[in-house]
Amino acid sequence: MSAAISRNWPAPAKLNLFLHINGRRTDGYHELQTLFQFIDYCDMLDFKVTDSSELILHSNMAGVVADSDNLILRAAKSLQQMTSFKGGAEIWLDKRLPMGGGLGGGSSDAATTLVALNTLWNTQLSTEELAKIGLKLGADIPVFIHGFAAFAEGIGERLQVVSPPEPWYLVIAPDAHVSTAEVFQDPLLPRNTPKLAIDTLMSQAWINDCQKLVVSKYPQVAKALGWLLEYAPSRMTGTGACVFGEFTQQQQALAALAKLPSDMQGFVAKGMNISPLITRLNHP
């Protein structure tokens, strides 16, 4: 008998509420301190367990990323191999998050795949075991698997649960694809921000060490940030290109969105300290 499709597994976006680069390691990775918070704007995935070991992905972004590079398929394959699960899955992705925008969409898709298939395949790995699989695929996948707003250190893998305010955000996605690798390789990137205690970081003004460099190289990011700063305290997330402004009320964010210039795209979303994925997992 054919298995039913398990629907509406969310893969939420994240924002880096601050991002400090503390140094570069001998292996080329950067030491950082950052604060992750989720927003209620998500890709959505559906899953169907199959008897065959084949992994099939259907996506409204078909052809953009080769199957061998697709984090969803790599995550599913890694879980198969780790657990020796003999079956497979058919996966449907409804891609809503901008690609390459600093919102973590690809990592979130991979995390949701690991969490959902661990449940649907009944492979019974712990959250920590899933996070270890995820870390091999991407440094920010573990925070999506754990599903709680977190202060992160190291290359982003050492997590401490925190509960920052949950404002409304207006997120603008400039028409620019910023290469994370190029940003971190740029000699002008600040790499010497002192490491600070979490209490100090949580109480001071929040900045993104990548922002000045990206704004100088990408006029679209500079324009979006300049516009948004007229309405609210605003910063870039990750290495960009997306920027976000903080509002205390949804109506304030929607009013600003209504004035968004026609050459920009944006959306309003709520900050969330508990990921929608955790809610979905606990309410199958």
From Swiss-Prot:
Record: active site: 14, 140
Q: Does the keyword Acyltransferase apply?
A: no
* Keyword hit for Kinase: yes
> Catalysed reaction(s)?
4-CDP-2-C-methyl-D-erythritol + ATP = 4-CDP-2-C-methyl-D-erythritol 2-phosphate + ADP + H(+)
Signal peptide interval: none
Q: What is its EC number?
A: 2.7.1.148
- Which GO terms are recorded in the biological process aspect for this UniProt protein? isopentenyl diphosphate biosynthetic process, methylerythritol 4-phosphate pathway; terpenoid biosynthetic process
Single GO molecular function = ATP binding
**For binding ATP, which residues are annotated in this chain's numbering?**
98-108
Q: Which pathway is it part of? A: Isoprenoid biosynthesis; isopentenyl diphosphate biosynthesis via DXP pathway; isopentenyl diphosphate from 1-deoxy-D-xylulose 5-phosphate: step 3/6
- Broadest EC class? transferase
Keywords of the record, alphabetical order, are: ATP-binding, Isoprene biosynthesis, Kinase, Nucleotide-binding, Transferase
Family membership, please give it: Belongs to the GHMP kinase family. IspE subfamily.
Known role: Catalyzes the phosphorylation of the position 2 hydroxy group of 4-diphosphocytidyl-2C-methyl-D-erythritol.
Q: What is this protein called?
A: 4-diphosphocytidyl-2-C-methyl-D-erythritol kinase
* Species of origin: Shewanella sp. (strain W3-18-1)
Q: What is the lineage of its organism?
A: Bacteria, Pseudomonadati, Pseudomonadota, Gammaproteobacteria, Alteromonadales
